Structure formats: C-alpha cells, structure tokens
Regions:
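Alpha-helix N-cap and loop-to-helix initiation/capping positions
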Residues: 28-32, 60, 64, 95-103, ...
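Short, acidic/polar
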Residues: 28-40, 99-114, 164-167
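Hydrophobic faces of well-ordered beta-strands that scaffold small-molecule active sites
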Residues: 14-18, 48-50, 80-84, 123-125, ...
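Active-site groove signature of glycoside hydrolases
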Residues: 112-133
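Beta/alpha (TIM)-barrel catalytic core signal, keyed to glycine-rich beta->alpha loops juxtaposed to Asp/Glu
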Residues: 134-326
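N-terminal binding-site loop/beta-alpha segment at the start of enzyme catalytic domains
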Residues: 1-80, 146
Length: 334
C-alpha cells in the first residue's frame, strides 16, 4: 500500500480507503462484510469511511463495523483511522437531519455507541444543509474535538463559499480542517474544475480551495457508481444498483454518450495494461491535490482488482491528452 499526507498535517492515509456506504448493512451478508474489512486491513487499507446513515438500514453499517472491530481488530485500533459523518436523514422528527449542533451532537454519541468506540479519528459535517449557519456547525465540530470524541474534523460536499468560511472558522479555533470530501470521477469533475467542462470557474474549484487552505482531499464515487467499468456496456445487469432502484443512480444516467466514452476510455486502459476501473482510480489519484480515494466493494476479489490500480499511477502526456479529449464534455457530467 502507498500512503500520502493529508494536506498540511502529519496524518497519512492509504491512497485507497474503504467506504462502507453500500454492502455492509443489515440487508447484506455479514460474513462477506467481515471478510472485506479484514482483507482491507491486511492489505494496508487502514482508513475506513462511515456515516451514520450508511446501511441500509441507516445505522446498520456502523453496527456491523463495530461488531467486526470488536471481534477481530480491537488490538489494532491504534493502527486504524476511522471516519464518520452526520448530516443526512437519520431518524424521525426535525432533529434527525441537517447540520445543526443538536443533530451533530446527538449523532456522534449514537455513532460511537453503534461502532463500540470511544472516539473517531475524524468526524465530518456530511453536508451543508442550506439553512444552518456554518458558524453553528463548525462550533459543534470544534466542541466535538475538545470533548475528545474525535481527533480531527472535516467537511463533505460543501459549496465553495461555505467551504472557505468553514476553513476560516476552524483555523481561528486552532482546529483545522484535516480532510474535505468531494465526489470526483472522469464523469464528474465539478469539484475539481469549479464547474462543468468548458464552463468552469477555477475560483470555485473545491479542490483548489482545499489545497490553498492546507486541507487534504478525499474523493468518493471515483467509478461513477459503476459507469466507469464494463458493467453497463451491454445494458443494465439485474444485480446493479440501477436495477435495484438506487436513489443515487438511475436508468437515465446510463446515456449512450457515457457508454461510448467509457468504451473509448476502456481501450486506453487496455493499452496501459489496466482494467477500466483501475485506470479510473489511477486518474483520480493522479491529481496531486488528492490524498485518498474511497472505494466501495462487494467482494474481496473486487477489492483486489481495485488495489491493482496502484501498480500504474503514471500517465504519459499522450494518454492525458487522449483521456481529456474524451471526458472534457459537459454532457458526460452528472
């Protein structure tokens, strides 16, 4: 495994981190989930990314992770970097969602209990909810660190203006933002570019704002939820997220333009000696501002395939040009 420092900090993360968004909930096979977490740790993936609403059912990924940790990895807690987040819908009533102090304080206590932990290594505000003042949310994160419930704090998916404000507040309190999470893939470059291809605004680039403020960047959905693999080349498989009526990927996302682009990218990957998925991961990691990339896997074999992306992280100028000619199109973006 290769490791990289988070922004202007002394914390290192593996280039590939394991996300528990899918495949670790109560509807999934517990033994398979356990095998994947233990295999990841054995392979040097020491960073595990959770959120209180991960499952399904919400909270069940935390519960399963806590059980696996308790049964197998308790002695290795100090070798692990465990992340958690709160801010999306979690429990009934007006306090079960959003970025308020009320929600974050209740959420971290619940999450620590489900995960059987005394503290998280990092705790994120999972989103800017559009209503709660950033000052309120950041003060909650600051207090969470001062209470010993998390060592570091982070933000996820914050728009550029709120992102900078969050950094300023945290810095003034001497609790700097360790990590900023954004979605990024060959088909989703808004955070990287500051807008859609051909209409980007570098001043709104979440990546550059993070880099300017010393925050590490961690990317999620690097495979565009399977679109940057061969999964959808010949239609929609019955076991795919789209077929399961995912709230995050729809049949309308599988456009002819994206399928053709994925096939063209697949040819470049083949010439590089990689699978499409491996090249897509390598491409995200090729941005020097990126600390780590979160992968979501459904099997040990799939995880091992993703890990092989680290065998070839370099792109020639010719490869970069060919790739950019394929992906620098607004119609490919989400």
């Amino acid at each position: 495994m290769l490791y990289k420092y988070c922004g202007h900090s002394g914390v290192q993360l593996p280039l590939l981190s394991l996300g528990l968004w899918h495949n670790f909930g109560s509807v999934d096979n517990f033994d398979t989930a356990s095998q994947m977490i233990l295999h990841a740790f054995d392979k040097g993936i020491c960073h595990f990314d959770l959120a209180n609403n991960y499952g399904p059912e919400p909270g069940s990924a935390e519960t399963n992770f806590g059980r696996i940790l308790h049964n197998n990895l308790t002695a290795h807690r100090d070798e692990m970097f465990i992340a958690n987040k709160a801010g999306h819908d979690m429990w009934p009533g007006v306090y079960g969602t959003g970025s308020s102090r009320k929600n974050l304080m209740a959420s971290i206590d619940q999450s620590l209990k489900r995960c059987r932990l005394e503290y998280f290594d990092i705790f994120y505000s999972h989103r800017y909810d559009g209503v709660t003042p950033v000052e309120e949310t950041m003060q909650a994160l600051i207090d969470i660190v001062r209470q010993g419930k998390a060592l570091y704090v982070g933000i996820s998916k914050y728009p550029a203006d709120k992102q900078q404000l969050a950094y300023d507040i945290l810095r003034e309190a001497h609790v700097p933002c360790l990590l900023s999470q954004y979605r990024c893939s060959m088909f989703d470059r808004k955070a990287q570019l500051g807008g859609l291809p051909t209409n980007e605004d570098p001043t709104k680039s979440n990546f550059q704002i993070a880099a300017n403020n010393g925050s590490g960047i961690i990317c999620f959905s690097p495979l565009a939820q399977g679109l940057l693999t061969v999964k959808y080349d010949n239609g929609i498989p019955a076991d795919s997220r789209i077929a399961k009526a995912s709230a995050f990927l729809h049949t309308t996302d599988v456009t002819p333009e994206r399928i053709e682009a994925a096939k063209a990218l697949g040819q470049i990957a083949k010439e590089r000696g990689q699978s499409m998925a491996q090249m897509a991961l390598a491409w995200v990691l090729s941005d020097e501002r990126v600390t780590s990339c979160i992968i979501g896997t459904s099997s040990v074999a799939q995880m091992d395939n993703n890990l092989q992306a680290l065998d070839n992280l370099q792109f020639t100028d010719e490869e970069k040009q060919k790739i950019n000619e394929i992906i620098y199109k607004p119609e490919l973006s989400f």
